[in-house]
């Protein structure tokens, strides 16, 4: 995300991230598996 901010600038980076839900972002950009994302969600909701 920080690379995108530096490369695109604030406005373009925000537009990129507004298009994604957190789940979509973690799956596509973070290269995390669906079970890994679920585990993160479980931990964060505690």
Curated annotation (Swiss-Prot):
- Tell me what induces its expression: By interleukin-4.
Gene3D superfamilies reported in the protein's UniProt record? Guanine Nucleotide Dissociation Inhibitor, domain 1
Q: What class of enzyme is it?
A: oxidoreductase
- Which keywords does UniProt give here? Adaptive immunity, Cytoplasmic vesicle, FAD, Flavoprotein, Glycoprotein, Immunity, Lysosome, Oxidoreductase, Secreted
Q: Name one GO biological process term.
A: L-tryptophan catabolic process
Q: Does the keyword Phosphoprotein apply?
A: no
Provide the catalytic activity annotation: an L-alpha-amino acid + O2 + H2O = a 2-oxocarboxylate + H2O2 + NH4(+); L-tryptophan + O2 + H2O = indole-3-pyruvate + H2O2 + NH4(+); L-phenylalanine + O2 + H2O = 3-phenylpyruvate + H2O2 + NH4(+); L-tyrosine + O2 + H2O = 3-(4-hydroxyphenyl)pyruvate + H2O2 + NH4(+)
Q: What Enzyme Commission number does this protein have? A: 1.4.3.2, 1.4.3.25
Cofactor(s) listed? FAD
Which GO CC annotations does the UniProt entry carry? acrosomal vesicle; extracellular region; immunological synapse; lysosome; sperm midpiece
UniProt keyword Transmembrane, yes or no = no
Drop me one GO molecular function for this one.
L-amino-acid oxidase activity
**Compartments where located:** Secreted; Lysosome; Cytoplasmic vesicle, Secretory vesicle, Acrosome
Source species, domain of life: Eukaryota
The residues that the database entry marks as glycosylated are 31
Please state the pathway this protein functions in, per its UniProt record.
Answer: Amino-acid degradation; L-tryptophan degradation via pyruvate pathway
What role does it play? Secreted L-amino-acid oxidase that acts as a key immunoregulator. Has preference for L-aromatic amino acids: converts phenylalanine (Phe), tyrosine (Tyr) and tryptophan (Trp) to phenylpyruvic acid (PP), hydroxyphenylpyruvic acid (HPP), and indole-3-pyruvic acid (I3P), respectively. Also has weak L-arginine oxidase activity. Acts as a negative regulator of anti-tumor immunity by mediating Trp degradation via an indole pyruvate pathway that activates the transcription factor AHR.
Family note: Belongs to the flavin monoamine oxidase family. FIG1 subfamily.
| Full protein name | L-amino-acid oxidase
Origin species, per record, is: Mus spretus (Western Mediterranean mouse)
């Amino acid at each position: 995300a920080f690379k995108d901010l530096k490369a695109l600038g604030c406005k373009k980076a925000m537009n990129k991230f507004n298009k994604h839900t957190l789940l979509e972002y973690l799956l596509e950009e973070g290269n995390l598996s669906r079970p890994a994302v679920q585990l993160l969600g479980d931990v964060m909701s505690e």
